[in-house]
Amino acid sequence: MHMKMNFIKLLPVLLLGACSTYQPQEAVEQPQQQAEIAPPAPARQAAVAAVAAVSKDNCGVGCPVGGSSQTLIRDAYTLNNNASTKFANWVAYKMTSSSQASGRSRTWRQDPDLPASDTLAPAAYTGANAALAVDRGHQAPLAGLGGSSDWQSLNYLSNITPQRADLNQGAWVRLEDKERALSNSKTVYTVTGPLFERNIATLPNAAGVQIPSGYWKILFTGSSPADGKFAAFIMDQDTPRAANFCNFQVTVSQIEQKTGLTIWSSLPANVANTIKSQKGALASDLGC
């Protein structure tokens, strides 16, 4: 499903446009810190003026097609927001040895570059951990991308979802650990996002906001997945903490069917159709 390209200059980020269309324990819930106040619009505009408005390619072989018109392109990641769910449809990022940084703080903020009605504020998570046993889970990971120039945007709630603690601190973080280790020697392109296949619960302090039923992640190394070095995973929100992420490998086609997205949108159709129906060979590099 292709949509008309429509790029609009953002405030503290590079672009907002229509797109043809979570490390070690860093992902673990931390005590909530006081939300910062976004700088006023003129200050953000001045920041933009000081930086060349160049789009970073965080997708490698085309960003997913079939999401919304709210696409944010940042140094750390590219994100497509869903104003209905209040979470991203997908988040894509490029991880390398130089993109990593440890010890980055978690200061949760509402995304200043989305309409306030289309994303969550920190108060939305009040009481969620106690009531639902969920953490604030990064989609683009903080440790793996903390070396980015705009790493603070990793803590914007547009990049966060309420993820069960057993998943966030279990199979999901172990996959992130392997992803980060792999990026020490190779460029890793990843796209990830939530699933809403059944009703589980709503955030207690955000009426009507459903928590995702699961998550998906697709990774490839090098310049293209066409050489077979890719892997895709789907993990249910209720995945036990001790589960092995290797047991949740799927095909890219399965993820496309569940999400309605077209992944790797710039790949030639004949190549895409072939590899998307396969599980790929990257899982062995991830310890599977």
Segments and roles (model prediction):
Residues 21-89, 95-96, 269-288:
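N-terminal module-boundary/linker segments of secreted carbohydrate-active enzymes
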Residues 9, 59-64, 197-204:
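Short Pro/Gly-enriched beta-strand edge/turn motifs at strand-loop
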